[in-house]
Structures are given as structure tokens and as C-alpha cells.
Amino acid sequence: MAPSRNGMILKPHFHKDWQRRVDTWFNQPARKIRRRKARQAKARRIAPRPASGPIRPIVRCPTVRYHTKVRAGRGFSLEELRVAGIHKKVARTIGISVDPRRRNKSTESLQANVQRLKEYRSKLILFPRKPSAPKKGDSSAEELKLATQLTGPVMRIRNVYKKEKARVITEEEKNFKAFASLRMARANARLFGIRAKRAKEAAEQDVEKKK
């Protein structure tokens, strides 16, 4: 079996001229400097906008292994923007990332991101396109003087863990079967449509029998 991914190479019996095929990594320090210079150049180019780019939504990581954690997503959904009262075309011009493919599967995620958008909108300093003729929604001259470029991520997302105090385990919790409950919940979700169809057919047959 061939070695897979980044694991240890077991019993390496080298026959070919392997010294010539060793992968080197001498460009790593220079690459680090190049990335840093590119970040600084971009920050200067987009100033006074935030250096890290537009604001991102709070999303939950996929799969059972990671879904207890939240992280930054790609862009806000169209529904979130609609509830927050921001037009999708205007959003991109004021530093809000938009992802039209994303769907909100829960009310909690929708509310959290709408709140995030409203908070961002309240903190935002909008420069007028024409300084001589500011429009409605643009920031005042005093606010513009206070504006500085944000270097870190816009409204950093943090995982908050709530600590629970120690208590006595109840009898109900002792008798609870977690694995069986999960299997049953999955089975009920999977068979929901089939059972509904069978119930409907049974009801129709009963009506026909009564006739």
C-alpha cells in the first residue's frame, strides 16, 4: 500500500537515486516576507477601509465533530441582509461580504447575523463620494476626522463557553440512552415522508370502505 498524506513512511526501502528527489523548503523565509509586504501594500491601497477585508458572518462548522464551534463564513445570506434592511448591491460597497448561495437553516443563525450587521452599521464611518456634497447616511465631518484603518479582523468572532456548576446527576439522566436516542431521531427524520404517505393512503382506504 502506497504512503498516504502526511504520515510517517514505514520501512522505506529506497532503490532509486532518492537524494536528488528530496523536496526542499529554502524559499519559506522569503515567502513569509513577500506575503507580509503584499498585506501591507493591500492595506495601503484600500485605506481607510479595514485591512483584513469585508465583515464576514458567523457560521457553525459542519459535521458532528466540529458543530459546537463557530467561525467566520464566506458571506451574509440575502435573507439576513433583507431583515437587516440593507440592499444586496449596497452591502458590497460598504464592506459587507455577500453570498447569495447561503441558506439560513435556523432562526438563531439568522438573528445572530442580523444583529451583527446592525452593530456593524452603527459603528461604520461612511465617507461621502463628494466631500463637498455629502448624502444621507454619510458620516459627519467630526466622525471622518476620527476614522482610522482597522488592522485586525472586523468584529472578531469568539467561541464563548458557558461553565456549569457541579450538581447531582438525576435518575432520568442516568437512564437516558444517548446513542439510541440519536439513532431513533435519525430514523424518524428519514422515515417521516414514508410514514405520512402510508397514513394518508390508510385514511383514504378507510373512507372508501365506509362508502
UniProtKB/Swiss-Prot annotation:
Modified-residue entries (N6-acetyllysine), positions: 16, 177
Keywords per UniProt: Acetylation, Cytoplasm, Isopeptide bond, Phosphoprotein, Ribonucleoprotein, Ribosomal protein, Ubl conjugation
GO cellular component: cytosol; cytosolic large ribosomal subunit
Record location of the Glycyl lysine isopeptide (Lys-Gly) (interchain with G-Cter in SUMO2) cross-link: 123, 145, 174, 177
Family matches, as Pfam families: Ribosomal_L13e
Cross-link (Glycyl lysine isopeptide (Lys-Gly) (interchain with G-Cter in SUMO1)): 174
GO MF annotation terms: RNA binding; structural constituent of ribosome
Cell location: Cytoplasm
GO biological process terms, semicolon-separated: translation
Top-level taxon of origin: Eukaryota
UniProt modified residues of type Phosphoserine: 52, 77, 106
Similarity field: Belongs to the eukaryotic ribosomal protein eL13 family.
Quaternary assembly: Component of the 60S large ribosomal subunit (LSU).
Function of the molecule: Component of the ribosome, a large ribonucleoprotein complex responsible for the synthesis of proteins in the cell. The small ribosomal subunit (SSU) binds messenger RNAs (mRNAs) and translates the encoded message by selecting cognate aminoacyl-transfer RNA (tRNA) molecules. The large subunit (LSU) contains the ribosomal catalytic site termed the peptidyl transferase center (PTC), which catalyzes the formation of peptide bonds, thereby polymerizing the amino acids delivered by tRNAs into a polypeptide chain.
Record protein name field: Large ribosomal subunit protein eL13
Organism: Cricetulus griseus
UniProt gene name: RPL13
